[in-house]
Each structure stands twice: as C-alpha cells, then as structure tokens.
Regions:
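ATP-binding N-terminal substructure of ATP-dependent carboxylate-amine bond-forming enzymes
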Residues: 1-94
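Internal nucleotide-binding/catalytic subdomain
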Residues: 153-294
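Short, well-ordered beta-strand elements within core beta-sheets of diverse protein domains
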Residues: 230-233, 331-333, 382-390
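Generic C-terminus detector
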Residues: 368-373, 377-425
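Short acidic-hydrophobic, aromatic-tinged amphipathic segments that line or gate anion-handling sites
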Residues: 43-49, 121-125, 156
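Active-site "cap" helix and flanking loop/linker of ATP-utilizing ligase/carboxylase catalytic domains
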Residues: 246-268, 285-358, 371
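A conserved helix-loop-beta module that forms one wall/lid of the active-site cleft
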Residues: 92-152
C-alpha cells in the first residue's frame, strides 16, 4: 500500500521510520518532509496547510492511507477534507481536534465530566482578566486558548508578571488570534508526565509514558520551547498512577468526547501533572508529541499501520498493543543556538553517517534540508533528535549523550541535563 505522511518535523520522521518497517507498505510519501525523512520516504514540496493540493496529490498517487502528524492541519479540519473526498486518513476530525485547538474547550469539558484538572477561569476581555488577577494567588498560569507552537503558556511568579502576560497574549497578540481568549489557572506542583494513547472513537489504548523537558536551558531555566529532550518510560509513572488515570482520566476523556458528539479517532497525548493530591490533566494534544514520538515509537512492537487502520475502523479492541518494556529510550534535541527566539540556519551538518548500522542509536531530523550542493544543512530551531535505547534509562541516557558528540554544526546547542531526574527516581 501507499502511505502519505503530512508534516516536516522529528515526529514525522519517527512516524515515517516506523511506517517503513510495515510489511504492508511499499511506498511512502511525506509532505513537505525534511532531509532525514527523505531516507525512508519521497518528500514532496506541499505545505501541511495546503489541503487542496494534498488531496489532489493523494488522488493522483492513489494513496491508501494518509497520516497527519501536525496539530495545525488537524485543528484546521484536514481530516474532514480528506474524508469528504473518500480518502482514508488517520487523525481526529475538526470537531474532535478542538480538544487541543481550544484550551477553554478542553478545560470546560474536564469540568463538565469531572476529569481531574487545575482550577481555572476563562477570559475574552483583557480588563476582566486583569481584574481577576488582583485577587488571585501567585504563582499563576496563563494559557493562550489557541495553538501557539507549544509556547503559549506563561508561568507567572508575581502579579506584575501576570499582568504583563495578559498584555502579551491578549493586547499585543503575540500569538495572534490564539490569544483572543485565555485560560488563567492555578499553578500546580509535582512532576510532569506525558502519556500517548491510540483512540478509535470508543476505546483508548495507552502506548507509554514519557517525560519532556520544555525549557530551553539547563536546570529548567529559560523560555518554553517545543521540547528539548525526552525519556520513556517515566519512572514516576507508577502502577498506582496508571490505575488512577485509567479509572478517572483516559477512558473518561474518550467517553466525554463521544457524549459531546465529537468522537475522537487518532492519538491523544495526555499531559499530566502528578500532584500531591493525585494526577491531574495539564493539557491534551490531538497527535503524537514531538519529541515524545521519538522515544515511544522505537519501543512499539506492533505494525503501526495495523494500529492506524484499527483506529480508523473502530476495531482497536482487537489490537494487542505491545511495547518493549525491557528497554528505555532517551532523546536529546540538538538545536540552533538562540532557539526559541532568534537563530541562524543553513549550516552544514557533519557526522550523520555515524548512526548508520548501529543498533540502539537513531537520529530523527526536525529542522534540516538539502542545500543546492546536496549537503544536509540546518533549517530550524530544533535541528535533530539524537536518540538511544538501553536496558534502562541510565544506559539509554549515557548512549544518547555519547551520540550527540558524533554530530557537529556551527551553532549546535543542547541541554546537558535531559533525564537527570532519572537519578532521583
């Protein structure tokens, strides 16, 4: 069969790499893809938001399955457009992708169906938001309602910071219309854990837990980013936590969406905070995380295409989801110095060939492209996800950091403390 993957990041590279292992698949296309993805797929120069062109391409090439990796096209309704044309596509429809597309929607859903989350208020009027802050307890969290590349969440320590945050999101419109409405919620303490799951509209099957590192600098300092590294599984995601979440969060979310007439098919990413009062939902994403996909998919033992098809057909109950639970994976992001603010790109990348033929070592491309001389060069803030698998997290971490030294480019930057929490577990 022929598969089209929509997106251009490390997540899509991990998906394409996994799809390439399927015995059912004989041709993979990726739109727009990147230099790394071109090793396993034919990259085509169509943007992820060019729905008409993507549909035309899928028809022309007789694509059997399209997989949407990114949040923007999902929230924009790409699945509805494909389905209307009779094309098979993996991902939630527009009315279900709102779970990620609107923070206010997801918070109201959790409140209505008693899914544990932080206390919150929503605002469309900046004056009312500022008024509310005057009596609120600090620190406090401000979230842009819409998509903001994972950067629309501000943690404010003081009232001044919080007021400045309202100005940034709602008045200066730093993230455009994403800040037309904001959620102000209580600051929760605890460890963050990400849990990825497959959903077929009726039931949910959990993949694995992972732990992200959102801040740009060591010691969780600096600005929020799309993620600077990850490890899986999380040692803090215990059997007790799993049982609680299965009882009160995972299936409850799928049931809530179904009850609202918005059945969800695809991947739900549960962003959880393990608070002293039990696990609570921080956020939902309507697709694989990036770099969560890079640490979870190497341990998936099923044919991923079978799982995608089961989600589309509502037959996920017939799939026995298998993970290599005897192995752990760590991913360290190599970024362009200056990310997530300003950075230069176009620098040649050396050392990629060192990953060839090495078991347990992977390099997933995020921001790369070929220059006019056919050289692979940097093309984004997050450039590569250097990933390694080991018998435990300690070994995987050691290997991943060892492998970061194989790669060089002019403004290479990384955090040196990805997975440091493993030692505290």
């Amino acid at each position: 069969m022929k598969v089209l993957i929509v997106g251009s990041g490390g997540r899509e590279h991990a998906i394409a790499w996994k799809v390439a292992q399927s015995k059912k698949v004989d041709k993979i296309y990726c739109a727009p893809g990147n230099a790394g993805i071109s090793e396993v797929a034919e990259c085509v120069p169509i943007g992820a938001m060019e729905f008409d062109k993507l549909v035309a391409f899928a028809k022309e090439k007789e694509i059997d399955l399209t997989v949407i990796g990114m949040d923007d096209p999902l929230v924009g309704g790409i699945v509805d457009v494909f389905e209307k044309e009779g094309l098979r596509v993996f991902g939630p429809r527009k009315n279900a992708a709102i779970l990620e597309g609107s923070k206010a929607f997801s918070k109201d859903l959790m409140k209505k169906y008693n899914i544990p989350t932080a206390a919150y208020e929503t605002f469309t009027d900046p004056e009312k938001a500022l008024e509310y802050l005057e009596t609120a307890k600090m620190p406090i969290v401000l979230k842009a309602d819409g998509l903001a590349l994972g950067k629309g969440v501000l943690i404010c320590q003081t009232l001044e910071e919080a007021k400045e945050g309202v100005k940034t999101l709602m008045m200066d419109k730093k993230f455009g219309s994403a800040g037309d409405e904001i959620v102000i919620e209580e600051f929760m303490t605890g460890r963050e854990v990400s849990v990825l799951s497959f959903v077929d509209g009726n039931i949910v099957k959990i993949m694995s837990s992972a732990q992200d590192h959102k801040r740009a600098k060591d010691g969780d300092q600096g600005l929020n980013t799309g993620g600077m590294g990850n490890f899986s599984p999380s040692p803090f995601y215990t059997k007790e936590v799993d049982e609680f979440c299965k009882k009160y969060i995972y299936q409850a979310t799928v049931d809530a969406m179904k009850a609202e007439g918005r059945p969800f098919k695809g991947v739900i990413f549960f962003g959880l905070m393990l608070t002293p009062y039990g696990p609570k939902v921080l956020e939902y994403n309507a697709r694989f995380g990036d770099p969560e996909a890079q640490v979870v998919l190497p341990r998936l033992e099923n044919d991923i295409v079978d799982v995608f098809e089961a989600c589309i057909d509502g037959t996920l109950d017939q799939v026995d989801l298998k993970f290599d639970n005897d192995r752990a994976t760590v991913c360290v992001i190599l970024a362009s110095d200056g990310y997530p603010v300003e950075y230069k790109k176009g620098f040649p990348i050396e050392g990629l060939e060192k990953f060839k033929g090495k078991d347990d070592y992977y390099v997933f491309h995020s921001g790369t492209k070929f220059n006019e001389n056919g050289q692979i060069v940097t093309n984004g803030g997050r450039v590569l996800g250097v990933t390694a698998t080991g018998k435990d997290l300690k070994e995987a971490r050691k290997k991943a950091y060892e492998a970061t030294e194989w790669i060089s480019f002019e403004n290479k930057y990384m955090r040196h403390d990805i997975g440091k929490a493993i030692e505290e577990a």
